[in-house]
């Protein structure tokens, strides 16, 4: 960005990364003299925008027969926490075979999805989650083919964009676990990074929780990470404090973990 002479601040650079990730090709479309929102409109939303139809070409450029890859991606795009293999089969109607395994492995190796094990669950119940920044943005804003050529400029600070910013920031955090560990001072500690969720069970004192990132450490500590996007200094509210306490309680009750749990705000 600096080399191109673009006068963007850290937050604007982050927002562009949330859309396109770190792929250099996409960063080459930014133009000097335009604001970030003007750039995004000219790159994605104007009538002849160069990347308006990028989704059509993205998977076709990587895979010879992209149809079933796209089916998997579209299925995963409907569920934030991801899907198990069985759920993918049910949603896509793709047969349970070695070919499906290959497709999932290829999507993972290309960085489109990630495979993780929910904390405390067996490996056979692995979850596949959509991670590609542009694909997530496409499903949220481009798939409906908006006709407003100034769509992004006119959507700033709307609930839809603010919700997307929060979700996109979570994905950025998941892509930068090594940097988060370094900041926490645990770079040398062996860890597993998981997500976790449980349903409400009032009879057993379980509130029902979704934790997008747990860093389970070899030194018997779990960093329960809350990832919050904010353009100003973030203040923990009473509601959020109660939510974090409920998540800690649920994790202890449902998983039976004996690890110390450190709430960690990112």
Put a short name on every predicted segment:
Residues 64-81:
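Short amphipathic alpha-helical interface segments
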Residues 4-58:
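Amphipathic alpha-helical "lid/sensor" segments that cap RecA-like P-loop NTPase cores
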Residues 11-14, 24, 38, 67-70, ...:
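Non-catalytic, well-ordered alpha-helical scaffold segments
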Residues 79-91:
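Short acidic, hydrophobic short linear motifs in intrinsically disordered regions
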Residues 93-110:
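Short amphipathic alpha-helical interaction segments
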């Amino acid at each position: 960005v600096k080399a191109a002479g673009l006068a963007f601040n850290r937050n604007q650079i982050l927002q562009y990364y949330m859309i396109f990730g770190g792929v250099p090709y996409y960063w080459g479309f930014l133009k000097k003299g335009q604001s970030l929102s003007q750039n995004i409109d000219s790159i994605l939303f104007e009538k002849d925008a160069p990347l308006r139809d990028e989704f059509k070409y993205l998977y076709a450029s990587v895979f010879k027969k992209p149809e079933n890859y796209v089916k998997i991606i579209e299925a995963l795009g409907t569920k934030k926490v991801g899907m198990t293999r069985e759920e993918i089969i049910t949603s896509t109607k793709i047969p349970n075979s070695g070919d499906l395994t290959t497709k999932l492995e290829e999507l993972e190796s290309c960085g489109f999805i990630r495979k993780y094990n929910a904390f405390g669950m067996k490996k056979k119940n692995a979850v596949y989650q959509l991670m590609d920044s542009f694909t997530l943005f496409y499903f949220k804003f481009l798939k409906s083919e908006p006709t407003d050529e100034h769509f992004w400029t006119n959507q700033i600070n709307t609930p839809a964009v603010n919700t997307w910013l929060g979700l996109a920031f979570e994905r950025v955090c998941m892509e930068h676990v090594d940097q988060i560990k370094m900041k926490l001072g645990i770079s040398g500690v062996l860890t597993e990074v998981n997500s976790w969720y449980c349903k409400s069970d009032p009879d057993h004192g379980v509130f029902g929780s979704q934790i997008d990132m747990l860093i389970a450490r070899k030194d018997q500590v779990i960093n329960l990470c809350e990832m919050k996007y904010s353009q100003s200094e973030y203040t923990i509210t009473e509601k959020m404090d109660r939510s974090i306490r409920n998540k800690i309680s649920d994790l202890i009750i449902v998983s039976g973990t004996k690890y110390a749990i450190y709430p960690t705000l990112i």
